[in-house]
A protein has these predicted regions:
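Catalytic histidine-centered segment of alpha/beta-hydrolase-like enzymes
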Residues: 209-218, 222
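Conserved alpha/beta-hydrolase catalytic His-Asp/Glu region
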Residues: 116-169
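Conserved HGGG/HGGXW glycine-rich cap/lid loop of the alpha/beta-hydrolase fold
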Residues: 1-36
Length: 226
């Protein structure tokens, strides 16, 4: 069983890693894909839910994208009976102005949106997950991110996940028992080189790639493990 754990970002699901070139475990985060939701979402509650599903708990290496990167760091803090050797946190948003947090909270409070067609629901999934233009609407990751009830469609994602909040990255990195690398695509609008370097001394920028670097060029991200 692989000890490589891949954690997706907000709005996506584990199928986003299908093109990854190495053996791995790629679960759905709570409230995404087929994973059960939680009464409320914090980085700790999400990490605990992920930890309970892991088939391997020792010498784990984690690549986490965006929200998944934060969950990876939370797991690396040692509070979940998971021995993490290394974390690559990719594309994590580290600056959270009040306006951004307010918008996220408002989204979390909205009711589930229903659509009359799969096409409409797929378009919404691709927008929410940041995969528009990168993934075909017919891709399995889209199917896994949708639910059909009778003749209507919705996202599998629990809107409450938007309320997970802003991570204390400095504390997460300081508390990590694992080696930590902060990585970003050169064109990622969610963060900057300077923001990451202010937090940590191991920063890698992937040339020409954007926020979903793991989808744009899985090999380039996988190379960070070598």
């Amino acid at each position: 069983m692989s000890s490589l754990l891949l954690l997706h970002g907000l709005g996506a699901n584990g199928r986003v890693w299908d093109a990854w070139p190495q053996p791995r475990v790629a679960p759905d985060l709570p409230g995404h894909g087929s994973a059960p939701g939680l009464p409320s979402y914090t980085f700790g509650s999400m990490a605990a839910a992920v930890a309970r599903t892991l088939p391997v708990r020792r010498n784990v290496v984690i690549v986490g994208h965006s929200l998944g990167g934060v969950i990876a760091l939370e797991l690396a803090g040692g509070g979940y009976d998971v021995d993490v050797d290394r974390v690559i946190a990719l594309g994590v948003k580290v600056s959270w102005p009040a306006d951004d947090l307010g918008r996220a909270k408002a989204l979390a409070q909205k009711p589930v949106a229903w659509f009359d067609s799969r096409d409409e629901a797929a378009a919404r999934f691709l927008k929410v997950s940041g995969l528009h233009g990168l993934v075909d609407p017919a891709d399995p990751v889209v199917d896994h991110g949708l639910r059909q009830v009778d003749e209507h469609w919705r996202l599998a994602m629990d809107p409450g996940t938007f309320a997970v909040g802003a991570p204390d990255m400095a504390k997460l990195i300081a508390d990590s028992r694992a080696e930590v690398v902060l990585a970003r695509g050169e064109r990622d609008p969610m963060n900057t080189d300077d923001e990451l370097r202010a937090l940590h001394d191991q920063v890698v920028t992937l040339p020409g790639l954007g926020h979903n670097a793991q989808v744009e060029d899985p090999e380039a991200v996988a190379a960070l493990l070598r």
